[in-house]
Structure formats: C-alpha cells, structure tokens
C-alpha cells in the first residue's frame, strides 16, 4: 500500500513539473494549426544573437577548459593542486554577477562594457569548468602507457596532448560544451545587462512588454528545440567518451615536471581564468 502511494505521489509531482511544458506544447500546436506561429519583430535577431553567443562562448570555454585540464592533470609544478580546486570557482559565481562587476569597473575606468564580445567573454569564463571537469576526467584515464610511449619517442607534453590525449578526450570535451550551452541558452541577467539580443530576453519582452504571447511561445519552442538538441548531444557524447575510456589502457599517469619560466607560465595560465 505504501509503495502504491509513493508511486502515485511521484506521478503527481512529475505531472506538476511537466505541466508548464505540456501547456507550452499545446499552445504551440494550436498556433501551428491556425498559422499563428510568429517570432515577433526581433525574433530573428534574438535567435541569431543566441547562436552567436553560444558558438563564441563554446569556443572560448573549450580552449580554456581543455588547456587547463591537460596542464593541471599531466604537468607537475608548484601550486597545481590548489589551482585544480580554483578552476571550480566560476561555478559558484553567477554570470550576472560577473557581468555586473565588469560593467561597474568599466564605467569607473571609462570603458563601455556592452555587446556580444563581452557577453562571449563573460559566459566562457562562467561556464568553462564544465569542459574542465569532463576533460580532466578523460585526460586522467589516458593512462601511463600512452604518456610513457610519448616520452620514449621524445615527444613533449604539448605534442602528446595534441597527438594522443586530445583525440581521445574529444567526446568528453563535446559533452562539456553541451552542458555549457544549456546554461548559456537559459541565461537572462547577463545578456540583458550587456545588451545582447537573446531568446531568453526575447521571451520576457514579448510576454511582458509587448503583450504578445504568440511570439513568446514561438521563441520558447525554439529555445526548447535547442536545449533538447544539446541534451541529446551530451548524452551521446558521454556514452562515446565512456567507450573510449574503456578501450584505453589506464593507470596513474606520470606528470611532466615544469621548472622556472615554464612553471611560472603554467601557474599564470591556471590562475587567470578563475
């Protein structure tokens, strides 16, 4: 009896959680039947702004997260352990807070912090830890044999990264980029503060400012399609990453020691993004 009650309660909670989505789909289907689906006067610009923000931030986050992931896993230098922990700090800092801080500092210095370029920088710095976490997991699984084989052939750490570790880690990096994209598409505060036309801001403006629920629903459906695509891509890439990891010889990797200017450069590279 208690198990049946728990099942009913779980079903009711699931229905409540899915109810807004079902309403959205119902309104969208009615609009399709009546030919009323329209994106509003700025819908195309908002979709383009979201896609550009997504692509630019994904590129920046991939470079930062992957480079730091390889450096902090497979190179040995003073402060490496603390820098690995520091890479997670952006996850505790909302993108809106980061953009507001930049706008405030820029206004005091006479700079205009506004537009797509700054939005890409903010979102890349706020979300790159997703790529960092998954890439470090993959790099850590690359194992001793691969790195020792590179050393025996006289290949340095960055050449080993480019030739061996990066191809193996690509599915994990792609999954991290998909997680980045889900957060970027749903960001509202930062894009409004920086004046970037986006789907999230467009939905709010269409519903509240323009009193156009049809356009708001249409934009929400476009957002839903993008997010579903990212979810499906993340799941597939995560499974592919596991298959790659299962087929790669494991073991504790021997880190390359860095000294002098190389160690200082590694410390700066790991310290600047957080």
PLM segments and residue spans:
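Amphipathic alpha-helical segments in well-structured domains
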Residues: 40, 44, 86, 146, ...
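Short amphipathic alpha-helical coupling elements at transmembrane boundaries
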Residues: 30, 34-38, 84, 107, ...
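Glycine/proline-centered hinge or cleavage motifs at structural transition points of membrane proteins
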Residues: 153-155, 167
């Amino acid at each position: 009896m208690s198990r049946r009650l728990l099942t009913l309660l779980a079903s009711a909670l699931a229905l409540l959680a899915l109810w807004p989505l079902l309403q959205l789909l119902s309104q969208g289907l009615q609009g399709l039947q009546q030919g009323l689906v329209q994106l509003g006067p700025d819908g195309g610009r908002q979709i383009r702004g979201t896609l550009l923000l997504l692509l630019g931030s994904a590129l920046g986050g991939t470079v930062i997260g992957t480079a730091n992931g390889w450096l902090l896993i497979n190179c040995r230098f003073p402060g490496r352990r603390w820098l690995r922990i520091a890479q997670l700090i952006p996850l505790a800092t909302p993108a809106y807070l980061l953009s507001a801080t930049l706008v405030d500092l820029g206004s005091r210095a006479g700079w205009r912090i506004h537009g797509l370029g700054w939005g890409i920088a903010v979102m890349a710095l706020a979300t790159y830890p997703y790529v960092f976490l998954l890439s470090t997991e993959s790099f850590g699984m690359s194992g001793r044999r691969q790195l020792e084989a590179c050393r025996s052939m006289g290949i340095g750490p960055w050449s080993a990264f480019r030739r061996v570790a990066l191809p193996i880690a690509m599915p994990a990096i792609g999954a991290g980029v998909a997680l980045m994209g889900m957060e970027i598409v749903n960001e509202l505060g930062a894009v409004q503060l920086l004046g970037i036309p986006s789907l999230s801001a467009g939905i709010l403006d269409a519903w509240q400012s323009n009193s156009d629920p049809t356009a708001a629903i249409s934009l929400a459906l476009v957002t839903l399609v993008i997010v579903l695509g990212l979810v499906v891509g993340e799941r597939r890439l995560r499974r592919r990453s596991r298959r790659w990891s299962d087929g790669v010889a494991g073991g504790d990797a021997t880190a390359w020691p860095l000294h002098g200017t190389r160690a200082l450069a590694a410390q700066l590279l790991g310290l600047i993004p957080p």
